[in-house]
A protein has these predicted regions:
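A short, structure-level motif marking secondary-structure boundaries and short turns
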Residues: 5-8, 97, 139-142, 181-183, ...
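Fe-S ferredoxin-like electron-transfer domains
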Residues: 48-193, 206-221, 225
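Basic (Lys/Arg-enriched) interaction patch that binds polyanionic ligands
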Residues: 196
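Conserved glycine-bearing catalytic or ligand-binding loops at nucleotide- and phosphate-handling centers
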Residues: 199
Length: 580
């Protein structure tokens, strides 16, 4: 790698040739502010906040896209630079809805933080004509409020990176705004509800629909029995809402907080994940042994499922018919558990705590009501739970560690790793390989399918039969693999697809980290590492060994793939138009 010698604020530095001034400054421990930059996703220099002085240049340059070269002298904090940044912030605010006190991003807004750093007041020096701002709340999962949009185009780039591109910059000049094609509302386009636009937005222009008031109303209703269950990844991300290190496992404190919020029972979605694996492994083995449609593709990610329904409606038979762990958990709670406890399912309210905004859409899907009532009534994001805990005055960090309630609080290590890309595949392999071979696995770690790469392939020989698998995360990568499946060049037997890059640990409902952190820290790897540690410490690490799952089959379902299991745990899919 060729190196060049530069100076930043008179400090000599040797850096790789061709990197941006922004990256070079970071290597020197200097943070240059930005509002639009997302590494390898949105590198367009649009916001003009990152302007710096370069000796010999006639004007300020954008640090995020300007490459360094030999002998360059850069100044990041001169009076000229600071004045430019402050003026730019004032211009942004001139058309901004400055209702910061009630904004969902107050305290985590990157624009708000920069205005504070550069002493920008609220007098509106450049206030003038204001455009009409669109407010779109048509979608089940999120709201777009263009009054808070700063045209950074991060959401557009995130949507493009997902190979969706349902939002973009419309019109020109002063009338430029972010919107859907043909100015249609979000519920009328092929948005898959993944929420990657939300976690990348620097302001409150895009955010999830908040269902916490409805959940609190149910908790306070004496006629309702309110049950909550939490997805595998939540235990290693919720702590970030309270300033804890990325990847801190707060499972015990999370359970304690949920009890203090007033939920009648606190269950673990990991139970549903174990159940999903048992059913999914049985379905996979059936397809392999009976000449069924292959490759079989996982169905845990609702963003991926909606993508498939919009973009590959002729390939829905490749999808596993298994419901997701969220929906399986809800279905079991309102059938088997309700029966055991003598509670009418109409009086049970099931709340899922999920890393995912698409889970909100999933609760409204067809064929998701095994008891005659919705399997899951409300799905809250990690962020919504964080806000509930904070508003209840609960000191999260000081809570004691508590255990989940049984019987749906019992789970295995295989379920914990669902939150990482490759986790579903690894969990399924632990069960499927044992069932195929009839022998106990010597090693439970299928490391070939781990890691944050977008596409991973592996092959295993079991009883003389080669099983080829593929693990995919991010919908752009899903598109690549689905094209291979479509044209017959994919020789896989089993494919795991997660809608969000890196899987659920990077879901659209997870805590929003500042872009500086997202650009220079691998959130996905840190969060996933905590899940693998949790798996390693579990007494049982194979889903089919779960005592709670065994009990469910013995008392209620019969056997994997039974008629009863299909009634309660399986679903179907529908072709969806791209526009309506």
């Amino acid at each position: 790698m060729e190196m060049v010698n530069i100076k930043i604020n008179n400090m000599p530095l040797s850096v790789p040739k061709g990197i941006s001034i922004l990256e070079a400054a970071r290597m020197a421990g200097i943070e240059i502010p930005t509002l639009c930059y997302l590494k390898k996703i949105n590198e367009i220099g649009a916001c003009r906040i990152c302007m710096v002085e370069v000796k010999g240049a006639r004007s300020l340059v954008t640090a995020c896209v300007y490459p360094v070269n030999e002998g360059m002298e850069i100044f990041t904090n001169t009076e000229r630079v600071r004045k430019s940044r402050k003026t730019t912030l004032e211009l942004i605010l001139s058309t901004h809805d400055r209702k910061c006190l009630s904004c969902i991003r107050s305290g985590t807004c990157e624009l708000q933080q920069l205005c504070k750093e550069f002493s920008v007041d609220d007098e509106g020096r450049f206030d003038g004509a204001n455009p009409v701002h669109e407010y779109d709340d048509s979608a089940i999962h999120m709201i777009r409020d263009n009054g808070k949009c700063i045209l950074c185009r991060r959401c557009v780039a995130a949507c493009q990176a997902q190979h969706i591109s349902v939002i973009g910059a419309n019109a020109r000049g002063f009338d430029t705004h972010i919107g859907s094609a043909f100015e249609k509302p979000l519920d009328s386009v092929a948005c898959v509800s993944c929420g990657q636009c939300i976690v990348n937005c620097p302001t409150g222009a895009i955010y999830e629909k908040d269902d916490t008031a409805k959940v609190l109303e149910a908790i306070n209703d004496p006629e309702k029995f309110v049950v909550v269950h939490t997805a595998p990844s939540i235990r290693v991300t919720l702590g970030e809402c309270f300033g804890m290190h990325i990847g801190t496992n707060v499972q015990g404190k999370m359970v304690a907080a949920l009890r203090r919020l007033g939920f009648d029972k606190v269950f673990d979605t990991d139970f549903g994940a174990d159940l999903t694996i048992v059913e999914e492994a049985n379905e996979f083995l059936g397809r392999v042994q009976n000449g069924g449609v292959l490759p079989m593709i996982t169905s845990c990610s609702p963003g991926w499922i909606k993508y498939c329904e919009h973009y590959y409606p002729d390939m829905l038979d490749h999808l596993s018919s298994c419901k997701s762990p969220q929906q399986m958990s809800g279905a079991v709670i309102k059938t088997w558990y309700a029966e055991k406890m003598g509670i009418d399912p109409k009086d049970i309210v099931v709340v899922g705590i999920m890393p995912c905004t698409a889970k909100k859409f999933e609760t409204k899907r067809e064929n998701q009501s095994a008891s005659g009532y919705p399997d899951v009534d409300y799905s809250l994001t990690t962020r919504e739970l964080g806000r509930m805990i904070e508003s209840a005055g609960i000191f999260f960090k000081h809570l004691p560690d508590e255990e989940f309630d049984n019987p749906l609080g019992d789970s295995t290590g295989a379920a914990v790793i669902f939150g990482a890309t490759g986790g579903v595949m690894e969990a399924a392999l632990r069960t499927a390989v044992e069932k195929l071979s009839g022998e106990e696995l010597k090693s439970l770690d299928f490391t070939e399918v781990r890691g944050t790469e977008g596409i991973k392939e592996a092959s295993y020989t079991v009883n003389g039969m080669e099983i080829k698998v593929c693990v995919v995360s991010g919908l752009a990568n899903a598109n690549t693999i689905m094209e291979k499946v479509k044209n017959g060049t994919a020789d896989y037997h089993f494919i795991e697809i997660m809608g969000c890059p890196g899987g659920c640990v990077n879901g659209g409902g997870q805590p929003i980290q500042h872009a500086v952190v997202r650009n220079f820290v691998d959130l996905r790897a840190r969060r996933a590492a905590a899940l693998y540690e949790a798996d390693k410490d579990m007494p049982l690490r194979k889903s089919h060994e779960s005592e709670a799952v065994k009990r469910l089959y013995a008392e209620f379902l019969g056997e994997p793939g039974s008629h009863k299991a299909h009634e309660v745990l399986h679903t179907s899919y529908v072709a969806r138009p791209k526009y309506k």
